[in-house]
Amino acid sequence: VKWLVALSIAGCGFSPMSASSDGGSASPPLDAAPRFHKQITLAVNSPTELRDFPVSIVTRDADLAAKAQADASDIAFTTTDGTPLAYELVAFDKSTGTLEAWVRIPRVTASVELELVYGGASIASAGTVWAPAIYAAAWHFAEASGPWMDSAGGHQVTPASPETTAVAAPGIAGSARSFDGFDDAAPGDPADSGLEFGTSSFSVQAWVNVAQSADPFDMVIDKGGDTGVPGYCFTLGTGSWYAEVGDDNYVATPFGTELALLGHWTQLTAVIDRTTNNLLAYTNGAFSTGVPFGTIGSVDGAPPLAIGSTQSEYRFKGIVDEVRVVKVALSADWIAAEWRNATMRSQFVTFGAAQTE
């Protein structure tokens, strides 16, 4: 069980809570004590079926403020027939009813309905939101300070000192981190090999909001991927923004040009697809560019993954949120659904009226 520490940001105080990571095992039936519930409709509108899809739920709800427990231990999500779903409660502010959560949807194409339940006895998640076969890492940056632990695989990135710690900022979902472009960086453990994929397919994703780049090459994700350094990275900066991957050599494909991507939240996704032997870049839920791997082999290498490069010439300046490392080649439909979920919340997630059981 992972405990998130309290966070105060933008005038909201967030209470600590836990998230299960038991791999999706079933939990006992929900407690029979009286509780409240609201129906949630998810308008996913995917052309193909998505399985074990994590949906972001961010809401400010007066009923939660009035009826939910302060530690959020009574808040849960179920199917419409009461079957518990896997969820992660990232943050809850009892005073305003502000909730940030993720819910794992077993399968969905067009739409699905579920229930938000609260106000009764404490209950547990029915497993982990982040399907172990899919997700290697998922960072939310909800902690008040570094280190920052991911919710999927327990990978940790740690700023070297308080002076090099990116400050909290409002994110695309809850809290994010704002890097100063000077010395802020959060490297992982050099002994952690859990984010290396050899010659297998994988994907990497980050949400960024950049007002002004620091340098020609600002690395928001840095795990090698350059000449003579196997791995992968996202290189932003004053020119085009790139996804890069390589062994001793590397290939790169652009997300787009800096001018078009400044001043707003941008979803960047790189898909390393070994089946088609291509590196694919997606920007804001849509395919951008792609390039063949050629002779690129294993991308395993010594540098640990860093969020915000530790290399002085590649410092990242901007806000980053919801960093993902994924064990599979994500589909275009999956990436597009993630983008709609984060940017079209009022259409993607709708709440019904409160009811009493």
What are the residue ranges of the model-derived segments?
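Ser/Thr-rich, Pro/Gly/Ala-heavy low-complexity intrinsically disordered linkers and tails
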Residues: 1-31
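GGW-centered surface loops in extracellular recognition modules
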Residues: 29-81, 93-154, 347-348
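Extracytoplasmic low-complexity segments
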Residues: 123-182, 290, 336-357
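Extracellular glycan-recognition modules
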Residues: 145-149, 182-242, 251, 276-278, ...
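Flexible glycan-contacting loops in extracellular carbohydrate-active proteins
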Residues: 171, 237, 290-319
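Short, aromatic/His-centered strand-loop micro-motif at the edge of beta-sheets
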Residues: 188-190, 242-267
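Localized edge beta-strand/strand-to-loop motifs within extracellular or lumenal beta-rich domains
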Residues: 264-280
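Ligand-recognition surfaces built from glycine- and aromatic
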Residues: 308-346, 352
